[in-house]
Amino acid sequence: MSEEEVSFSRDYFVEMDVRDEEAHELASDWFDEVVFTKKLVLEDPPDWGSLKEELKELRGKYGKVALLLVTRKPSLIREVKSRNLKALLYVQGGDMRINRMAIESGVDALISPWFGRKDPGFDHTLAGMAARRGVAIGFSLSPLLNANPYGRAQILRFMMKTWQLVKKYRVPRFITSSAESRWEVRGPRDLMSLGINIGMEIPEARASLNFYPRTIVWKL
């Protein structure tokens, strides 16, 4: 099935990253599928048994679950990836070593590689590697909501530059709220508007909420 066939067969939208119970409930009213994301901040390896049990409970409650790894240690990405956690694996971008390791390790998605940076954190080399390894780039709305006007303008500029590379190299991608509260949840139209604002055509923005998310969710 082609990107265009999936995108325009009907309005079917997927929210790939919601991190709060109330946010998930609200997003479920607006999207056909919602992935609940557990945020995991690591400096050292976790208790794997406890983590697997928690993810099992979350799958029972929400169905589709992702694990967002936030770490300063690149080696932990490979370690988490090697475990059979039965959840999508996202990595919070920012540190260039983390961005590179996430892509090299073949995680499901790198979220906001520009996060906290003075540049996009994503270049031609990483774009080519992400395309080959099927690592999606997550364009997240949440940091924009929490930034001052200067910060928002800078983030949008980094998003635009990243989108140009994503488009050129045909990197998988999705647009998401990354909502950590119900107040940060936005519907498909608002997320599509973000895509259009960073340079996507309407079909490209739609595919970032439909075709690409669905191909990722099918892994579960």
From Swiss-Prot:
Residue spans crossing the bilayer: none
SUPFAM superfamilies linked to this entry: PHP domain-like
Organism domain of life: Archaea
The enzyme's E.C. designation: 3.1.26.5
Gene Ontology biological process terms, A to Z: tRNA 5'-leader removal
A cellular component annotation (GO) from this entry: ribonuclease P complex
Reaction equations catalysed: Endonucleolytic cleavage of RNA, removing 5'-extranucleotides from tRNA precursor
GO molecular function: ribonuclease P activity; RNA binding
Cellular location(s): Cytoplasm
Cited Pfam families: RNase_P_p30
Annotated keywords: Cytoplasm, Endonuclease, Hydrolase, Nuclease, tRNA processing
Function field: Part of ribonuclease P, a protein complex that generates mature tRNA molecules by cleaving their 5'-ends.
HAMAP family referenced in this protein's UniProt entry, alphabetically: RNase_P_3
Subunit structure: Consists of a catalytic RNA component and at least 4-5 protein subunits.
Sequence similarity: Belongs to the eukaryotic/archaeal RNase P protein component 3 family.
Protein name listed in UniProt: Ribonuclease P protein component 3
Gene name tied to this protein: rnp3
